[in-house]
Design a protein with these regions (language model features):
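Membrane-cytosol interface segments of multi-pass membrane proteins
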Residues: 1-174, 181, 263, 275-276, ...
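Membrane-interface micro-motifs in multi-pass membrane enzymes
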Residues: 45-48, 129-137, 186-201, 242
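Short, amphipathic, aromatic/basic-enriched membrane-interface segments that mark the entry/exit
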Residues: 126-132, 210-217
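Internal transmembrane alpha-helix with an interfacial aromatic "cap," most often the third helix
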Residues: 142-144, 200-210
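Signature aromatic-anchored transmembrane alpha helix within multi-pass, membrane-resident enzymes
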Residues: 162-166, 215-229
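Alpha-helical transmembrane segments and their interfaces in multipass membrane proteins
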Residues: 179-186
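Alpha-helical transmembrane segments of multi-pass integral membrane proteins
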Residues: 197, 201, 223-331
């Protein structure tokens, strides 16, 4: 199976961007107001949508043909999904439950550990708040055999994308009211997120042609991606539904499929990509630790305070993720198997 190494860059930069966004959103003493802090960094919250497209493409690379041709058992597929998501997420849930130690935390923690908590009506779980993404992605995994059916061929895939966009729009504009739901329908809901997963699957169906085109037209594809991103921010205040994000992130994924540039292909992003999910899940825990250190009493410059808080948060998350994923878990598994 061909390895698309530039996807590592997208995962790494998306994870870092989400940390930047969360630190900016939560820090009490804000940095200087400018286009970067008021528009660019807050937009990084949408990198979770990029993660969805990448996740769908990656899972299709590994399992689309095997599920379509009946070459893998459901037991094997879902065991690997649990093995990938549950250990680190479960650890974060247990830590959060211990810290909160109340009945609500226990109930929410139990729901989290099933990974099926997005089957709840309007889940609004505070234990590992960023864990909503795990629930949405695992719902996609549960539906993946059906997803494979929907993308059985390219023609059906585009039809399904069109239908999913209509359903998403109706869900947001009609069903997202107190008559139908308690909580507004957003990316936590699989109907809202479905077009992003479907786009990832459609890109998979065209992956060979995309790879050949991007490889031959590297600068043209990069220019198109940059222009689309710039246009997205120029018309950022115009409500065009989820279409702009869908287009921009899809084009960046297509660029990454055939790209071999050093920005998306280097040792740093390759390493960060391996722990990108873990960084995403644990970074807010480290932000809360840094917050209690009250760096604002030491650093007078607001911009330097934000940068220092971000660096301390991301470094803490990287170190913790590395130790748990590459040292603690392997040794624990080895002992259990002996």
């Amino acid at each position: 199976m061909k390895k698309y190494e530039s996807l590592d860059g997208l995962r790494a930069y998306a994870a870092i961007g989400i940390v930047m966004m969360h630190v900016l959103a939560n820090i009490i003493v804000k940095p200087s107001s400018n286009y970067l802090t008021e528009t660019i960094i807050p937009y990084f919250t949408n990198f979770t949508l990029l993660f969805m497209i990448i996740s769908a493409f990656s899972v299709c690379c590994g399992y689309y043909e095997r599920i379509k041709n009946g070459q893998i058992r459901p037991n094997d597929f879902y065991k690997k999904r649990y093995k990938r998501l549950l250990p680190f997420f479960g650890l974060m849930v247990i830590i959060s439950v211990i810290m909160d130690h109340n009945y609500s935390a226990l109930c929410e923690g139990f729901a989290n550990l099933t990974l099926c908590f997005n089957l709840l009506p309007n889940p609004n779980i505070s234990i590992v708040g960023v864990g909503w993404f795990i629930g949405t992605v695992f719902t996609f995994y549960m539906l993946f055999p059906f997803f494979t059916f929907l993308l059985d061929n390219k023609k059906r895939g585009f039809f399904v994308l069109f239908i999913s966009l209509i359903f998403c729009y109706i869900a947001i504009t009609y069903f997202s009211t107190s008559d139908f739901v308690v909580k507004k329908i957003d990316r936590v809901n699989i109907i809202y997120s479905a077009p992003f997963f479907i786009c990832g699957g459609l890109i998979y169906l065209y992956k060979d042609k995309i790879y050949d085109f991007v490889s031959r037209n590297y600068y043209l594809t990069l220019t198109i991606c940059i222009l689309l991103t710039v246009v997205k921010f120029i018309f950022n205040k115009i409500d065009l539904f989820i279409i702009p994000d869908l287009i921009v992130f899809s084009f960046w994924l297509m660029y990454a499929i055939g790209s071999h540039d050093k920005i998306l292909n280097n040792k740093f992003v390759s390493y960060i990509s391996k722990i990108s999910l873990e960084i995403y899940l644990c970074h807010m825990m480290f932000y809360r630790v840094i917050e209690k250190c009250h760096l604002e009493n030491i650093i007078d410059n607001n911009n330097l305070l934000y940068i220092s808080t971000f660096l301390a948060t991301i470094i803490g998350a990287i170190v913790f993720s590395h130790i748990i994923k590459f040292i603690v878990f392997p040794r624990t598994i080895d002992k259990l198997l002996k």
